[in-house]
UniProtKB/Swiss-Prot annotation:
NCBIfam families from the UniProt entry: PRK04313.1
A GO MF label: rRNA binding
Stated name of the protein: Small ribosomal subunit protein eS4
Source organism of the structure: Picrophilus torridus (strain ATCC 700027 / DSM 9790 / JCM 10055 / NBRC 100828 / KAW 2/3)
Keywords, alphabetical: Ribonucleoprotein, Ribosomal protein, RNA-binding, rRNA-binding
Amino acid sequence: MITKTKIMMAPRKLKIARKSRFWAVNSLPGSHKKDSSIPLLIALRDYLKLGDKEREITRILTNSLVMVDGKVVKERRRGIGFMDTLTVSGNDYLVSYDRKGKLVILPKPGETKGLKLLRVKGKTYVKGGRIQISFHDGSTMVTDRKDIKNGDSVLVKIPKKEIVDVLKFAPGNRVFITGGSHVGEIATIKSIEIKSSSGENMVHMNEGFSTVSSYVFVMGSPKYTFSMPEAIAE
């Protein structure tokens, strides 16, 4: 298994100085896709500036000072991605996108402490007639709820992933754009155009633009809106 790559070849979504080092570690498979995740080593060293040497970051991890979504993580190659909560020495950070499509790590608003939004990517029926839901971060959940649809966002408590609310992929709801020319923007769904072909459904916004449904991450309804860091919500 290839554990590192030349930093010039690292995923373009990483917001790092590409001339500062020669090598960059690769994210482990299993959570977010490689091109949409930040290995913890890079997150702690290059983003949060908690150490300059790999051994300094390894020491922080070994001492159980780092959590992802409320669970202690010691693996330096563990990848974190959009909507993950990174906790270091009690301080919470949220992984998001800036207006250039780069992954950023910003202080997490206090009102969202202990909460996470998960976008539904797929559903399958399992034994007993229950439903297994797969999410954007690679995680899954088995539930009896049949009202949860693809494209919806599920608000959960972390780390146990107890469902708090379901934000529907529907007109009138607020969304965060995760790709395309409007990446990093927050908008409101005006209408959803269902394609009869194999092409992606189009989502039209009140703000006057449209994008494919896979770039739309529901973050708010008339009753609740998940607060994003100020630098992203502007």
